[in-house]
């Protein structure tokens, strides 16, 4: 059977500065989270999240959450990178309730994956424009973190 190969890119962490509960919409319940402070670091790039990012996530009737995130990253050498992703988080109702209550829950108890894409005009990071990546996430009471991998 063929094997899917990947290479670690970076770990990204972000806080939520403000949450807007839009309410019940046709696809579920819409929340718009304004992203606060954050950073990313890996072997080929590191830096910070710029203010103004947001997650326009949907909480679906089946209990899963679908993120819809837009961020601008600034590398430590000043390059700007637009990052956008969607994905899915799901787990048992009891585990999701613990996360919602702010409890620290092991990421082995739920599924949190995303598919980031990147856009940049910076020549040094141009390779990001042509890759597929996958993020494996965990939700902490005060931030979210994702380990991001390039699919080779």
What are these regions (language model features)?
Residues 1-152:
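Beta-strand-enriched cores of mature, soluble protein domains
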């Amino acid at each position: 059977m063929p094997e899917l190969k990947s290479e670690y890119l970076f770990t990204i962490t972000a806080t939520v500065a403000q949450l807007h509960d839009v309410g019940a919409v046709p696809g579920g319940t819409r929340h718009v989270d304004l992203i606060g402070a954050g950073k990313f670091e890996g072997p080929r790039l590191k830096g910070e999240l710029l203010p103004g990012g947001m997650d326009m996530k949907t909480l679906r009737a089946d209990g899963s959450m679908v993120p819809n995130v837009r961020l601008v990253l600034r590398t430590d050498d000043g390059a700007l990178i637009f990052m956008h992703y969607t994905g899915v988080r799901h787990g048992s109702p009891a585990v999701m309730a613990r996360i919602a209550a702010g409890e620290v829950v092991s990421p082995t108890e739920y599924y949190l994956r995303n598919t980031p894409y990147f856009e940049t005009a910076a020549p040094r990071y141009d390779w990001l424009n042509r890759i597929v990546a996958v993020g494996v996430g965990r939700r902490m009471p005060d931030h979210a973190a994702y380990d991001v991998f390039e699919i080779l």
